[in-house]
Amino acid sequence: MNDEPFDDDIAYFHAQWRRQRLTEKGRDYVVLDGVKGEGHYVGTYLALTTLERYWWGEGEFKFYIDDDEEYPTICGTGTEDYFGGSWSFAKQVNGKTVEQNYCTPYLGYPYYSSHDELIHNDYHNDDCPPMRGFYRWHIPDPIRFL
């Protein structure tokens, strides 16, 4: 390892991991903060468990970039829209709404489950709150910051 400081124009990789048991109503959930220097936002993987069985997707993704304070540079219309699932991630099958997973190179919904497949108990069902996994990589649409 070189103990000398790096030049200011060298790119750094920043990654953050967060977990919050319950989100607070009316308060934004922060995905990334505290990044210094210039670069571009590469993407997000979001794992989400809903504690109710009904619609979970509202809550727009906001990107406060550089000197943004009151209003974000980018503001979406809903969590499902950010991950490419406008009008939900579902289809109708025999009169029932069924979750529809998908994967593309830059965004997707690869995981859905409402069953706990790791635990078996003869006295209880294997159902659990719905769990979802989403990703979006900003390769074709980089979000740059200075």
Task: Give the residues covered by each predicted segment.
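Beta-strand-centric surfaces of beta-sandwich/beta-rich domains
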Residues: M1-L146
